[in-house]
Amino acid sequence: MTQTKINADAIRAMKVRGEKIAALTAYDFPMAKLLDEAGIPIILVGDSLGMVVLGYPDTTHVTMAEMEHHVRAAARAKPCALLGADMPYRSYETPETAVKNAKRLAAVGAEFVKAEGGREIIGQVRAIITAGIPFCGHLGMLPQHVLEEGGKYHIKGRDDAGRMKLFDDAAALADAGAFAIVLEIVTPPVAKELTKALSIPTIGIGSGQDCDGQILVTPDLIGMFPWFTPRFVKPKVYCAAEIKSAVAAWKNFVQSPGGAQ
């Protein structure tokens, strides 16, 4: 059965219907194809690729050229899912650079872009949307700011000041025209309040089960990056172990008398 192409309006409509939104990351053609065939409505080419694909210590090392390369690969899957891309570190410091770089990502297949921050980037958000590119916000723990926070990932919304900032930033993003907001490592009660208060979908990661949807880094979900797994992730399968087992079995076969393939 042919699937219908999903756009930002369809994602907003899912919140209206009370339908939970499942989103995952892909960094290449085969994973984008598999996720699309599994019916995932949002596929994000995340800057998490810096850590789980390129071996960087954090996402601040990812470049625009690297994002373009991986978006182009994922876009070749021609997914029915809405395909988005993270704007990498320092690629949206002014409205002008934000639009220029969002257009670069759109040119290689991104159907929306996501950037970290709230009221402080509203000028950039408005400029991107005015340029005709759908925008998804990202609040809570901001991986691109990890070095500014001493290299630690901190839970957000624990105190009144943090809660008020989240509400202010979320309202600003919604007013600017964002079609959805990712909430990363926000205290579940605050994430639940934000979800009820906003007319646009919230997509949680490590923020409890009361958001309008959930997103995970796919290698975390499938146990493909065993060297680090966030505490809030429970892998559904352990692909890394399966790969090592298969490789070891093949190696033994090759090295056995008469082994060939």
How should each PLM-predicted stretch be described?
Residues T2-Q261:
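Alpha/beta enzyme core
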